[in-house]
Regions:
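Membrane-interface helix-loop-helix junctions at boundaries between adjacent transmembrane segments
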Residues: 79-153
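Membrane interfacial helix motifs at helix-loop boundaries and amphipathic/re-entrant anchors
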Residues: 32-61, 105-133, 185-204, 240-265
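Loop-to-transmembrane helix junctions at the membrane interface
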Residues: 74-95, 215-235
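Alpha-helical transmembrane segments of multi-pass integral membrane proteins
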Residues: 20-31, 94-105, 132-141, 166-189, ...
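C-terminal transmembrane-bundle signature of multipass membrane proteins
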Residues: 27-32, 182-192, 201-284
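Membrane-interfacial, low-structure loops and terminal tails that flank and connect transmembrane helices
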Residues: 1-11, 152-171, 284
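Hydrophobic cores of alpha-helical transmembrane segments in multi-pass inner/ER membrane proteins
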Residues: 61-71, 133-150, 204-215, 263-278
């Protein structure tokens, strides 16, 4: 008779990171639950969330935070290592792309929250602080949980050497798209939008350029730092670009002029990530 093998003990640090990340989702999920069920929590103008499109957007973004909760648990408990890699990597890649720019842009966002124009918005002032504070909290803790998980599951990516080959046409097109998107975001950062939106454009531009440089030099030096830069920059291109496309088509007709470049940006992010994944080291 075979004795059952005990699951490895989970460190206190990983449990703290996991449940702190989950705790960071609760204020946002509470707001979304209120709005999709007809509540007016944090709303100056309840009609702001009454349309079918806004209900869909709130369900979508609330669902994304539910996925974040599941990921935090998967990154911590042993069952998470049995999930097929694509089901883990795709959502956390998009999550990285959405959350990392917010974390990096947080000082500008905080400065923007002090503006008196906020008093004219349909949401109470404290809602903005809760939402963006929660995103930054999740960005730090969820990505920390992922790094610890990835270190255990794919340790050979850190210790191994890059697989021979070139970035190919896929990588070349991705780099071209990244540089084009970076140029567009720098141009957009000089628009008349709010400071936080303009700061976000600068952050996405910088991340895209760093990803392009990392992919172009992926065969030189250590692989994993370049993988991190491509992962983050390509994720920012795909994640922020996809969200901007949704906003342009669904919530802000004024952004339709950005649609062609945003589409190039999303495709470019996918191409860059595809290219770098082909160079992953093999497990020994």
């Amino acid at each position: 008779m075979t004795a059952a093998v005990a699951a490895p003990k989970i460190s206190s640090a990983r449990l703290i990171v996991c449940y702190a990340a989950i705790l960071g989702t609760l204020p946002y999920l509470t707001l979304k639950a209120s709005w999709v069920t007809g509540g007016d929590l944090g709303l100056r103008d309840p009609s702001f969330v009454d349309s079918g499109l806004m209900r869909f957007a709130n369900l979508l973004t609330g669902g994304m935070d539910v996925v974040a909760v599941v990921l935090a648990l998967a990154f911590t408990y042993s069952w998470g290592r049995r999930i097929p890699a694509p089901l883990v990597l795709f959502p956390i890649w998009i999550g990285t792309g959405l959350l990392a720019p917010i974390v990096l842009n947080l000082p500008v966002i905080v400065a923007d929250l002090t503006k008196p124009e906020l008093d004219e918005m349909p949401l109470e002032n404290w809602v903005w602080a809760v939402v963006y504070g929660g995103f930054a909290w999740q960005g730090v803790l969820l990505l920390t949980a992922f790094v610890l998980y990835a270190r255990d599951r794919w340790w050979f990516v850190v210790t191994g050497t890059v697989r021979p080959g070139s970035i190919g046409v896929t990588g070349g097109l991705g780099i071209a798209a990244a540089l084009g998107a970076a140029t567009a975001h720098v141009f957009w950062s000089f628009s008349t939008g709010g400071m936080s939106a303009r700061g976000q454009d600068v952050v996405v531009a910088v991340l895209a350029v760093l990803a392009a440089i990392a992919l172009a030099t992926v065969s030189r030096g250590r692989f994993w730092p370049r993988l991190v830069l491509v992962w983050t920059g390509a994720g920012a291109m795909a994640g922020s670009g996809a969200w901007a496309l949704f906003s342009a088509f669904g919530m802000s007709a004024s952004g339709l002029g950005h649609v062609p470049m945003l589409a190039v940006q999303v495709v470019g992010g996918v191409l860059m990530m595809t290219s770098v994944l082909r160079r992953l080291p093999h497990a020994a």
